Design a protein with these regions (language model features):
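ABC ATPase NBD Q-loop/coupling interface
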Residues: 5-21, 84
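ABC ATPase C-loop
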Residues: 100-101
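Walker B catalytic motif
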Residues: 112-113, 120
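Conserved beta-strand-loop-alpha-helix hinge in the C-terminal portion
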Residues: 157, 161, 165-188
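Hydrophobic anchor residue at the start of the ABC signature
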Residues: 96-97
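Conserved catalytic loops of ABC-family nucleotide-binding domains
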Residues: 128-145, 150-152
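Walker B motif beta-strand of ABC-family P-loop ATPases
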Residues: 106-112
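Q-loop/switch helix immediately C-terminal to the Walker
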Residues: 32, 38-52, 64
Length: 190
């Protein structure tokens, strides 16, 4: 934040450390997810759930994890692999969407989740995002430079930011305008 304040659920959070924001129900999917050797994807998600006070019996957890992995077409063996270690770019993005679906945050920020994805992975990630929207009444903030992923989603609002400033807000029709005319018209307004 370069200026102003960030409020979430009636609480100012711009001074809160990231882990406390996560405990409040925020989720951030990174553009370039890091590899964490020694911690499996499954244990990472289960630990994050427990930190949020969600304690599932092991068999119930495994069943929910498997069902969610099936939605995202992720092989079950990935649950026992080190977090993001040796994952392709698309597999890392799917793993992040898996975490979002399992943690069910009230506010999720997806930072270029579509970056580097092939057509099939983009469809799978879009399906995961729509699944989040169906089962959660929270908010989703998608940062992207490519409108392809947005075309597969139900978009309520579209915002354009240039150099950290919000320059345009509209409904989903703004996506069509961007596809037809690009971003340049908004950049020169700055």
């Amino acid at each position: 934040v370069t200026s102003g304040e960030i409020w979430f659920k009636g609480q100012r959070i711009d001074d809160l450390p990231c882990y406390k924001r996560a405990l409040e129900g925020m989720f951030l999917s990174f553009q370039n997810p890091i590899e964490i050797p020694g911690i499996t994807l499954s244990s990472f998600i289960r630990s994050a759930l427990e930190q949020r006070g969600i304690k599932l019996r092991l068999m119930q957890y495994k069943k929910e994890l498997k069902n969610t992995m099936d939605i995202l077409n992720i092989d079950e063996s990935y649950a026992d692999r080190d977090l993001n270690k040796g994952f392709s770019g698309g597999e890392k993005k799917k793993a992040e969407v898996l975490q979002m679906l399992m943690l069910n945050p009230s506010f999720a920020i997806l930072d270029e989740t579509d970056s580097g994805l092939d057509v099939d992975a983009t469809k799978t990630v879009s399906l995961g995002i729509e699944e989040y929207r169906k089962k959660n009444d929270g908010s989703l903030f998608i940062i992207t430079h490519n409108t392809k992923i947005l075309q597969a989603l139900s978009v309520d609002y579209t915002h354009i930011m240039v150099d950290g400033s919000l320059v345009k807000t509209s409904d989903a029709s703004l996506i069509d305008d961007i596809n037809a005319n690009g971003f340049a018209q908004y950049e020169k307004d700055q």
